[in-house]
């Protein structure tokens, strides 16, 4: 049985906030420039830790296991380590992890058998609205479940190697395919629920990794999920990755944004 890995980029501030983590895309390819204008880079103390998705000018969606006491985001970036005039930096004024996410799981070095990692999503309220431009654009939430066998695109600046953390400069993309959740239930000891999506990478030695957590899963042109958990090491051939199924959370997302506008 494969160990689970959270796609978070580092052990935060000496706090054992997550199991050993990996968050890059292994076996991906350089995304076409500005092709993912909703892609967000989440930072903690100037260090990239997670991905995210811009939902509107004031809100970013990411993974609950990316929670830290204070963070900031970069929007409109293509290259992680380069200054880009079109990129925008915003502080996060408040974080809203989903109340159903079990934060105590982040204290484990390895997730225990039967652990329920459901509800792994979090909203970030920006301190200043994003400027919508050609390279910074929000993406709509899904309105219906994705179809099985859909071809999906995942993107992020997570590690590009499975066992040694190596961040890419260029935003990485990777194609993956939606599977029945039963496939993930067979591959993992944790509980697999209907608020999760299960994917298999199209090719060997591919998959999201450390730093990709919270990044978008786009299926047939529609945002359907955010990166959650996967095998350790990343990109094990034939082993599925798990994403948060966003259509299940439309009400919570919209209510939280409205009540904290």
Curated annotation (Swiss-Prot):
Gene Ontology BP terms: proteolysis
Propeptide: 19-24
The protein's Enzyme Commission number: 3.4.21.54
Keywords: Disulfide bond, Glycoprotein, Hydrolase, Protease, Serine protease, Signal, Zymogen
Domain Peptidase S1: start-end pairs: 25-258
Active site per UniProt: 65, 120, 213
Cystine pairs: 31-173, 50-66, 152-219, 184-198, 209-234
Residues spanning the signal sequence: 1-18
UniProt keyword Protease, yes or no: yes
PANTHER family: KALLIKREIN-1 (PTHR24271:SF47), KALLIKREIN-RELATED (PTHR24271)
Family: Belongs to the peptidase S1 family. Kallikrein subfamily.
Protein name: Kallikrein 1-related peptidase b16
Natural source organism: Mus musculus
